[in-house]
């Protein structure tokens, strides 16, 4: 396993320069507490969780503010993460992946997200793209595309959303018309994470008639004539990853780059998104966990009216509620991850529930943490505001939380 060469580190996050504290673990301030994210894990899971926490502390947390403020895409750091197996966490080992489970993946992304939620979210999307190729591609495609994705020598972006089709993804209009041994793509995709920087674009496009059965999945490689990108979007958060439109103008792509059969694209998209919802919910857990620790430490240090804020019962109760909601969200996410791994019939509904609950609750936790920091929480010298901004979009992407409610109710009503 790729973890064999890793040092055995304790699960802790350090301090950012300039007082930008993320998570401190010394003595009684350890994760051995009621919010300990290692509870219920086996020894192997605890070990790679420690590796992920340490990587977040050393490589991500000290840089997350700079990446955010300068809008830097941390290629070198992500490639270091890939050396630990994080570039292809749930990709099969024969093409360079770590071959871990969905639960293992959730544990890792939660830990990494404490160091930089935005960067971890991109890594999770990259993993989802690699999984689609690994799971639905033929052997030639798997061995061509997956190894450089697992090492993050190459980066991947997922192209589903269009200017006119967001939640109604099955109505997408980007066309792929077959001409000989190529498809000619025309159309555009919107809000694509990594666009312009990524090397591999997993594109859902229309090869047939209207509706989901007319959609196919095609890999478009950077540098293909007819592939271009829009301007870099200015965003509230997720600033360590670029977001652009992806544009196809008579873009000729080999038929050999089609993943799966014609008309299978929507199934691939949906299957990928089930896992993507677990991944993004796990990123929310990491942001919320870091925010709870930040708030706990602030309440112990900050004094008003001659007493530490921690002595105020209202603030005690609020902190208790934050911790309780964090643990509840984590349990939901991990339960859904196991259901997805086991391919249970209720997996789609459970993934939707976990994504809905975790992203809503964890954003609320981060936002409450900012409030409890008072004016300091609104300053960019303090990390809590970045967790708020980076976790807000999780309620929108990988299927908005309104769509999650549709999927959950549909599952209940069709029983």
UniProtKB/Swiss-Prot annotation:
Q: What class of enzyme is it?
A: oxidoreductase
Pull one GO CC term from this UniProt entry.
Answer: mitochondrion
Q: Which GO terms describe its biological process?
A: lipid metabolic process; valine catabolic process
Gene3D superfamilies with a match to the protein in the record:
Acyl-CoA dehydrogenase/oxidase, N-terminal domain (1.10.540.10), Butyryl-CoA Dehydrogenase, subunit A, domain 2 (2.40.110.10), Butyryl-CoA Dehydrogenase, subunit A, domain 3 (1.20.140.10)
Its domain of life reads Eukaryota
Places the protein is found: Mitochondrion
Cofactor(s) for this UniProt protein: FAD
Q: Which GO terms describe its molecular function?
A: acyl-CoA dehydrogenase activity; flavin adenine dinucleotide binding; short-chain 2-methyl fatty acyl-CoA dehydrogenase activity
Please list the reactions this protein catalyses. Answer: 2-methylpropanoyl-CoA + oxidized [electron-transfer flavoprotein] + H(+) = 2-methylpropenoyl-CoA + reduced [electron-transfer flavoprotein]; (2S)-2-methylbutanoyl-CoA + oxidized [electron-transfer flavoprotein] + H(+) = (2E)-2-methylbut-2-enoyl-CoA + reduced [electron-transfer flavoprotein]; propanoyl-CoA + oxidized [electron-transfer flavoprotein] + H(+) = acryloyl-CoA + reduced [electron-transfer flavoprotein]
Q: Which residues carry this modification: N6-succinyllysine?
A: 50, 213
Q: Which UniProt keywords apply?
A: Acetylation, Activator, Branched-chain amino acid catabolism, Disease variant, FAD, Flavoprotein, Mitochondrion, Oxidoreductase, Transcription, Transcription regulation, Transit peptide
A Pfam family annotated for this UniProt entry: Acyl-CoA_dh_M
Biological role = Isobutyryl-CoA dehydrogenase which catalyzes the conversion of 2-methylpropanoyl-CoA to (2E)-2-methylpropenoyl-CoA in the valine catabolic pathway. To a lesser extent, also able to catalyze the oxidation of (2S)-2-methylbutanoyl-CoA.
Q: Which family does it belong to?
A: Belongs to the acyl-CoA dehydrogenase family.
Q: How does it assemble?
A: Homotetramer, formed by a dimer of dimers. May be part of the large multiprotein complex ARC/DRIP.
| Record protein name field | Isobutyryl-CoA dehydrogenase, mitochondrial
Q: Which gene encodes it?
A: ACAD8
């Amino acid at each position: 396993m790729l973890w064999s060469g890793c040092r055995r580190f304790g699960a802790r996050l350090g301090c950012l320069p300039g007082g930008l504290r993320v998570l401190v673990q010394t003595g009684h301030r350890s994760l051995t507490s009621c919010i300990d994210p290692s509870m219920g894990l086996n020894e192997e899971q605890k070990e790679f969780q420690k590796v992920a926490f340490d990587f977040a502390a050393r490589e991500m947390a000290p840089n997350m503010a700079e990446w955010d403020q300068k809008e830097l895409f941390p290629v070198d750091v992500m490639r270091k993460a890939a050396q630990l197996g994080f570039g292809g966490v749930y990709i099969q080992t024969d093409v360079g992946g770590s071959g871990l489970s969905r639960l293992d993946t959730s544990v890792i992304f939660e830990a990494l997200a404490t160091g930089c939620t935005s960067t971890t979210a991109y890594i999770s999307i990259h993993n989802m793209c690699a999984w689609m190729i690994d799971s639905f591609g033929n052997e030639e495609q798997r061995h061509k595309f997956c190894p450089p994705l697992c090492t993050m020598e190459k980066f991947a972006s997922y192209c589903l959303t269009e200017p006119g089709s967001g939640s109604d993804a099955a109505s997408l209009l980007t066309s792929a018309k077959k001409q000989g041994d190529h498809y000619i793509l025309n159309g555009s995709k919107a809000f694509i994470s990594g666009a312009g920087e990524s090397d591999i674009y997993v594109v859902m496009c229309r090869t047939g008639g209207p509706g989901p059965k007319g959609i196919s999945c095609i890999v478009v490689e950077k540098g293909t004539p007819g592939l271009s990108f829009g301007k870099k979007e200015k965003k509230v958060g997720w600033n360590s990853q670029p977001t652009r439109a992806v544009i196809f103008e008579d873009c000729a792509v080999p038929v050999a780059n089609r993943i799966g059969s014609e008309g299978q694209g929507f199934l691939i998209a949906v299957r990928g998104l089930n896992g993507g919802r677990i991944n993004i919910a796990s990123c929310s857990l990491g942001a919320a966990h870091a925010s709870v620790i930040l708030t706990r430490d602030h309440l112990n240090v900050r004094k008003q009216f001659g007493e530490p804020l921690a002595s105020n019962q209202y603030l005690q109760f609020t902190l208790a509620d934050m911790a309780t909601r964090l643990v509840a969200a984590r349990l939901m996410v991990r339960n859904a991850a196991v259901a997805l791994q086991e391919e249970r019939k209720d997996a789609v509904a459970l993934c939707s529930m976990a994504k809905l609950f975790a992203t809503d609750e964890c954003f609320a936790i981060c936002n409450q943490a900012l409030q409890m920091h008072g004016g300091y929480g609104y300053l960019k010298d303090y990390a809590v505001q970045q967790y708020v901004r980076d976790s807000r979009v999780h309620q929108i992407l990988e299927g908005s939380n309104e769509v999650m409610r549709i999927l959950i109710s549909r599952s209940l009503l069709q029983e």
